[in-house]
Swiss-Prot record:
Residues covered by the RdRp catalytic domain: 466-579
Family matches, as Pfam families: RdRP_3
Species of provenance: Carnation mottle virus
Keyword Ribonucleoprotein: no
Protein name: RNA-directed RNA polymerase
GO MF: nucleotide binding; RNA binding; RNA-directed RNA polymerase activity
Additional remarks: Readthrough of the terminator UAG occurs at position 246.
Catalysed reactions listed for this entry: RNA(n) + a ribonucleoside 5'-triphosphate = RNA(n+1) + diphosphate
Signal peptide location: none
Length: 763
């Protein structure tokens, strides 16, 4: 192909392209002209519709409707027909009187619900929710779940049917998460020029310059010269009044009971005149929920009242009376359960003294080593079973009861404990497993972590279609353990040890107790038949055994028991509530116990077991102590803070234990984290754990939790359990992080109570 041919083809191509461009331009011009004509035509039609409809056609209708505009404006919607009602098939049946064939009869008809009333109801529950959750609520998942649960509960209280409940809750949610006129006015007031001026005035007063500066600025003001004269003569300059921030470390002296009443012929009293030795309770009050704790002194007055009111008598109608006794033959009825317990538990033999000593550590191990060595030289004697009584060093809440009867501890000699421990120490775990099998699942919650306890409760809860939990415990369980109850308990042990004569002799010493209690200002000597002595080796085992078997004997229905001594929770079907409540109180009274049944609960988080509630953290369940109690109780120490280092060591021990059992839990993990941060790099003192060998430290022994982010699901579950809203949780955590615990020991002062949201006085 030559050059002329290329030129010819180029000319032809350009001509064709130019023609196509021209045709396209003409087509666009024609379409634009048509579009202008169509637009003008639609404008004319639109103007005609606006004029003919009076402007109503301008309102854009949502495909889902917009029923909440009137609610948000706070006004009722205009309804053409006031009698218009909700769909008939969604309303409940009601019984009304009607006249049929001249006779008045009762007929069922659908309730008519006026939409004006619906709107007022929606606004009413929305206002209740705003008041409960504190006004403007952040749009988090936890808050959404909490508000939805709250609104649904309000509808259930008014017996709203499920279809209407869904409708009302969805409408009220819009109002709750939308600022109302009151919140707008509040924020407008806070942002006003007047409020700004007041804040500036306050800041200027609090940030006053020194007296020298004020004198130079106003040299002709006689007040400035008089202030200088006062400063030169040793007085303070004129400064704004400030109040010292509460917080720091101090101690409280032990308390004496103010009540002295009663007496018993089996108690010999010797009131001495020696000076009293006071106990001390150490406190940090920078972070508190308002509860105050004290500790009883080991004194004659406390010892006397503790023995009389917790061992010999019970209170009824504000009078001291003898403990109730079981009905004759009541424990014989449970012979079949003893035989079943023996079959499941099997036969056992005692362990060696060395094996028993190996079960302990620290100071207690040394005591039992010496006792075991003495038994090699001298056999067990009757006097080894005598009791040595003292007042328990226990923190008690003065806000709940200002002057309770002190608790007494009544241990027998270490020699007796070694002999009895050789039988029961290792056997105890087999006995718990036997009780589990009798009840059909984990029952005795001894030795489990908080996660394991909660998981066992959750498993028991899921065994029922409509579960309900009924908590119950026995008032002063140890005091109500009669001779008949002890004999039944002992028969269970003897059956498993094939009637061992030495064990029978040891257990017989518990039927008639001889004890003495010494204090610095007096002493008491007494004899008591029956009653559980709190220092016995078999206290925990015996209480669990009696509680589980008596409850099993009383409950002839399908149920599950969660037990820890005298603290019990029974889970069953809702249809069996009346049977359980009626049989618990009357049934336990036949065995000489005073059973107190709590209100049934229908939600997992509402269960209370050992002063803890189940909380779901997003991955699993765990038991959480009530923050109102734990955050105040864990601010008080029975371990002496002799110096700042001891105080920090205690803070570190408590903080680390708290994080191990409550890591990832709202509010409380920040509380324990603040303890750890305050302690800094102080060396851990393991002796503190031994001195504070309480349930708190024992719970943390096998726990493996730690500080972690709090999930939205956990915040919702925490709200369900303790009523602290998610926004309040976040606010409390921020408050705790901003606080500083002063570890210098100072004078006694009132608690800071900075976490007032948790304080029951304000709820």
């Amino acid at each position: 192909m030559g050059l002329p041919s290329l030129l010819v083809e180029g000319v032809i191509g350009c001509t064709l392209v130019g023609g196509l461009v021209a045709v396209g331009s003409a087509a666009l011009a024609v379409r634009a002209t048509i579009g202008v004509v169509e637009f003008n035509r639609e404008c004319v039609r639109g103007a005609r519709r606006i004029v003919s409809s009076g402007g109503r056609c301008l309102v854009v209708q949502s495909p889902y409707g917009n029923p909440n505009q009137g609610l948000i404006r706070g006004e009722d919607e205009e309804i053409d027909n006031v009698e218009e009602s909700t769909p008939v098939e969604l309303t409940p049946l009601i019984e009304v009187k009607a006249e049929v064939d001249g006779k008045e009869v009762v007929v069922s008809k659908k309730r008519v619900v006026n939409r004006h009333l619906r709107q007022r109801f929606v606004r009413s529950i929305a206002i209740e929710a705003k008041n409960h959750f504190g006004g403007d609520i952040s749009p988090s998942k936890a808050n959404y779940l909490s508000v939805s649960k709250f609104l649904t509960g309000k509808c259930k209280e008014r017996h709203v049917v499920p279809a209407h409940t869904r409708d009302c809750v969805s409408a009220a949610m819009v109002l709750v998460f939308t600022p109302d006129v009151h919140e707008i006015r509040m924020m407008a007031g806070l942002a006003s020029d007047a409020a700004y001026g007041i804040k500036i005035a306050m800041a200027s007063i609090l940030n006053r310059k020194g007296w020298c500066w004020r004198l130079m600025v106003n040299p002709l003001d006689r007040a400035r010269w008089w202030e200088m004269w006062c400063v030169v003569n040793g007085f303070d300059s004129n400064k704004p009044v400030t109040f010292p921030k509460x917080g720091g470390l101090f101690y409280l002296n032990g308390v004496e009971t103010k009540i002295r009443r009663g007496g018993h012929p089996s108690v010999i009293e010797v009131d001495g005149q020696c000076p009293l030795k006071e106990r001390k309770l150490y406190v940090q009050n920078a972070i508190t929920t308002g509860y105050e704790y004290r500790v009883h002194n080991h004194s004659y007055a406390n010892l006397r009242r503790g023995l009389l009111e917790r061992v010999f008598y019970v209170e009824r109608n504000k009078e001291l009376v003898s403990c109730p006794q079981p009905e004759p033959g009541s424990f014989k009825e449970m012979g079949y359960l003893r035989r079943r317990f023996h079959r499941v538990c099997g036969n056992h033999t005692r362990i060696s003294a060395n094996d028993l000593v190996d079960c302990y550590q620290g100071r207690k191990r040394t005591i039992y080593e010496n006792a075991a060595a003495s038994l090699l030289d001298r056999a067990i004697e009757r006097k080894d079973g005598d009791l040595k009584t003292f007042i328990k060093a226990e923190k008690f809440n003065v806000n709940l009861k200002s002057d309770p009867a002190p608790r007494v501890i009544q241990p027998r000699s270490p020699r007796y404990n070694v002999e009895l421990g050789r039988y029961l120490k290792k056997y105890e775990h087999h006995a718990y497993k036997a009780l589990d099998k009798i009840w059909g699942g984990p029952t005795v919650m001894k030795g489990y972590t908080t996660e394991e306890v909660a998981q066992h409760i959750w498993s028991a809860w899921n065994q029922f279609q409509t579960p309900v939990a009924i908590g119950f415990d026995m008032s002063r369980f140890d005091q109500h353990v009669s001779v008949a109850a002890l004999e039944f308990e002992h028969s269970c042990y003897l059956a498993c040890f094939e009637g061992d004569a030495h064990l029978a002799n040891l257990l017989k010493m518990q039927l008639v107790n001889h004890g003495v209690g010494f204090a610095s200002n007096g002493m008491l000597r007494y004899t008591k038949e029956g009653c559980r002595m709190s220092g016995d080796m078999n206290t925990a085992l015996g209480n669990c055994l009696l509680a589980c078997l008596i409850t099993k004997h009383l409950m002839k229905i399908r149920s599950r028991l969660i037990n820890n001594g005298d603290d019990c929770v029974l889970i069953c079907e809702r249809t069996d509530i009346d049977y359980v409540v009626s049989n618990l109180t009357t049934g336990w009274s036949r065995f000489g116990f005073n059973c107190i049944a709590e209100e049934p609960v229908y939600e997992m988080e509402k269960i209370r077991f050992c002063q803890m509630a189940p909380v779901f953290d997003g991955a699993g369940w765990l038991m959480v102590r009530d923050p109102l109690v734990s955050m105040s109780k864990d601010s008080h120490s029975l371990v002496h803070w002799n110096n700042e280092t001891n105080a920090k060591q205690w803070l570190k021990s408590v903080g680390m234990c708290g994080l191990r059992i409550a890591g990832g839990v709202p509010v409380v993990q920040e509380f324990y984290q603040k303890y750890v941060e305050t302690a800094g790099n102080v060396r851990e003192n393991k002796n503190i754990t031994e001195k504070s060998s309480s349930g708190f430290f024992m719970m943390a022994d096998r726990a493996k939790r730690g500080y972690s982010a709090v999930s939205e699901v956990c915040r919702f579950s925490f709200y369900q359990a303790f009523g602290i809203t998610p926004d309040q949780q976040i606010a409390l955590e921020g408050e705790i992080r901003s606080l500083t615990i002063n570890t210098n020991v100072g004078p006694q002062c009132e608690a800071a109570d900075s976490l007032w949201i948790l304080n029951r006085k304000y709820q």
